[in-house]
Regions:
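ER/Golgi luminal nucleotide-sugar-dependent glycosyltransferases, focusing on the catalytic module
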Residues: 1-216
Length: 216
């Protein structure tokens, strides 16, 4: 018996067959019509009408309300079509659809049993081209010129404020419970890298606790 359930999210019904071939659980999001083999965030208790704002988290809400008790594996994972967890580092030019099934994580081996969560490679905002930021957000540099000369000053909060509106992050952080609020605020103010795409693998019990924190 497999010790992990992995959900693969897609916006395109044409991806269903490949996801099934990989033995992942297909999830169809967005407005297109999927087969009844696909899980969807539109049935039962849901917030699918907020998908434009919350992305994959409308599906996470759906799982929390309608499906969580049906997951009987120790581990649970979430990936996206064309973004998967692989067993080991592999060159991109060595990957194709024919060998995908052999290189993807399908089980959690005993070496990882002591971990609570598995994440993908981090993305560093330090790698973002400064010329692009200056071109579109020159005023922000005038208000805070130190960020022009120090990558560390261009932390996650700096980038969030630039691309998603200044002050919105602080409003969101203020909604967190007291046990997480300051830790997350410090993380955004100090770090310059994060794990993207809302992809993660964790123990199912931890997922339950996670949902209790992020959803009201």
């Amino acid at each position: 018996m497999k010790n992990i359930s992995i959900f693969c999210l897609t916006l395109n019904p044409e991806h269903e067959k490949l996801i099934e071939k990989l033995s992942y659980i297909p999830v169809g999001l967005g407005e297109k019509i999927f087969s009844n083999k696909c899980l969807s965030d539109k049935s039962e208790l849901n917030i699918s009408n907020k998908n434009l704002n919350y992305g994959e988290y409308t599906f996470h809400y759906w799982i929390w309300k309608n499906y969580l008790n049906k997951i009987n594996t120790t581990w649970v994972g979430f990936c996206q079509y064309r973004k998967f967890f692989v067993k080991s580092k592999i060159l991109e030019d060595k990957i194709d659809f024919d060998n995908l099934d052999n290189i993807l994580i399908k089980e959690i081996n005993y070496k990882n049993e002591n971990f609570d969560c598995i994440l993908g490679n981090k993305f560093s905002v330090e790698d973002y081209k400064i010329s692009k930021i200056i071109k579109h957000h020159f005023l922000d540099f005038l208000l805070n010129p130190k960020t022009l000369f120090s990558k560390k000053k261009r932390n996650l909060k700096f980038h969030f404020d630039i691309f998603h509106g200044k002050g919105n992050l602080d409003l969101a952080i203020d909604l967190l419970d007291e046990s997480n609020k300051e830790d997350f605020r410090n993380f955004m103010n100090k770090e310059t890298a994060f794990n993207p795409h809302n992809m993660f693998i964790c123990k199912t019990e931890i997922l339950k606790n996670y949902y209790e924190v992020i959803f009201p």
